[in-house]
Amino acid sequence: MALLARVAPGRAPDGRAFRDALGRFATGVAFVTAAPDGEPAGLIVNSLTSVSLEPPLVAFCPSHHSLTWARMRRARHFGVNVLGRRHERFARCAARAGADRFADLSWETGRGSVPLLTDALAVLECEIVAEHPAGDHSIVVGRVEALRTSDIDEPLLFYAGMFRALQ
C-alpha cells in the first residue's frame, strides 16, 4: 500500500495528486443534455449526485471552461442519461471537445425539447433550480420532473481515469 502524500498546512494539494486521489472514487457516467435555442447539446459527466428526495433534486458540476455548458445553461431544462457499458465508445468520443455528440445516437425529445437517449439505463428530465460557482466549476442543481429506468445493460463506470465495467 502506498503511503499518503502529505500536504503542508496552509498549502493546497498538487492538482495531479488531487485528481489521482478523487480518481479512486468509482462513479457512474452520464450524458447531460439540453436544447438551448432548439439545438441539441450534451456533455459527459461523472460528477452526478442526488441532492434531495423531497423534492427530488440532482446536481452535476460542469467546468467554467466548457463551451458546451456555456451554451446549455441558457436552457431551462436538462436531461440526465445514465450510460451503460454499450455506451463506452460513445462516451470516449463525446468527452472530446468539438465532438458531434448526437451522431449515431437513438434519442427522443423530452420536456423543453431536451434530447433523451432511448437506450440509457436511466433518464431524468430536470428543470434547473440553481447554479452555484465553486472554484473552476459550477454546481448545477436540477429538480427531477420525470424519470424512467431500464435493466438493458450494466452501468458504465469511471475509475482511476479509465472507463470500467462491473465485475
Q: Where do the model's predicted regions map?
A:
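Basic, polyanion-binding surface patches
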Residues: 1-167
